[in-house]
Amino acid sequence: MSSTHTHSKKSQSLTKNQRIVLDLLQNSGEPLKAYFILYSLKKEGLNSPLQVYRALDKLVELGKIHKIESINSFIICNNSNCAKNTAFTICERCGKVKEIKNRDLTGGVSDLVKDNQLEITRYNLEFYVLCKSCKIN
């Protein structure tokens, strides 16, 4: 998957499969697994895992969605000013995922790369937390 993550102001041409996968993710408001997407969209004509994975890969490449690696799920990108790489919090109790953007965090990663003469092709930061609701209960 590509590390490019930009939102174009121009509407990019999406295939039918990409549009229906994107619509499902937008309407869900939560991370979805590929096989759940396949099951949910069979009536729309998506009949094979390959169709779903191709659509998901392209949507990630276009910066429309993110893959949450640790839970092997996909979520809509909610950050209109998103950078190349993004971080998430995942509640250990309820499973709620939140996209976060923090300049200090990304600056720290940039410093790490520079100090160690590395070239990051992409990164995916996932923090396991107790969300506000679960912390109270």
Task: Enumerate the language-model features and the residues they cover.
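Short capping segments at the starts of secondary-structure elements
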Residues: 14, 27-33
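Short coil turns linking two alpha-helices in DNA-binding domains
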Residues: 48-49
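Basic amphipathic alpha-helical segments that dock to polyanions
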Residues: 52-62
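Short acidic, hydrophobic short linear motifs in intrinsically disordered regions
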Residues: 31-41
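Short amphipathic alpha-helical elements of helix-turn-helix/winged-helix folds
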Residues: 20-28, 40, 62
